Amino acid sequence: MALAEKIGGSQSGFVDMLNKRLKEIGATNTNFVNAHGLDAEGHYSTARDMSIIARELLKHPKILEFTSIYEEYLEKNDGSRIWLVNTNKLVRFYDGVDGLKTGFTKTAGYCLTATASKNNFRLISVVMGEDTSENRSSDTVKMLNYGFNTFKINIIKTKGESLGKVRVEKGKQDKANIVLLNDATEILKNTDPVTEYNFNLKVNKIKAPVKVGDIVGTAEIIDSEGNIVDEVDVTVEKDIKKANILDYMLRNLKTIGFGKSILKQN
């Protein structure tokens, strides 16, 4: 509650921020009326929305450093210690599970939004309304087993791979190498063959200065049947500074054919 008041100015202000962010990420069947998550009229969500929220949270992987801890001791000022145990037992008992959040209320039952990663393939599972904590764990195991046994991830191109060059306005370099900001992937069934892919690069007009990590467009990944299987943000391979007057002079000289001879004389 203190954190909500710190971030939102008040609990209601924080709730407004939450609901606004939910709409932005596509969790349109969720509405919060309080900051603590306990049952209340008008306070609801769905399994699908919880998976969307989890996916957004995983864009900040540092969270897994905390959610993957099974047990820890907190030391008090008097030297005594408090033993804390993760209520997500799968962190310890299922290989690859490293998060995310359990929950329980009388209305919602025992809930678990879990995530696990194996062979660079990460899954998110959501169970709600379970009768016991044991059932929420066992049903989560069934879902994760099904996912890992049925599907695989095909990495089409890796983060940082080049997709070609595009023009840069007012830059020290007039062209930039465009690279993927993240891996381009497709989820396939284990029995599906890998197909051929094409890339449709959609880049905004780039104007210097521009830095590595700045999103300058997207790349559509298209399979052999013409389906868009992924769309990945793209960035520049190297920082490009804004050109100064000397850069323009040298560029113009090279364009008319004198640049090389002048540079040699210097």
Predicted segments with their positions:
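Acidic/histidine-rich, surface-exposed loop or edge segments in extracytoplasmic proteins
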Residues: 1
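Mid-domain, small-residue-enriched loop/turn segments at the edges of structured enzyme/sensor domains
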Residues: 4-55, 62
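Domain-terminus/edge residues, biased toward the C-terminal soluble/receptor-binding domains
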Residues: 27, 42-44, 48-266
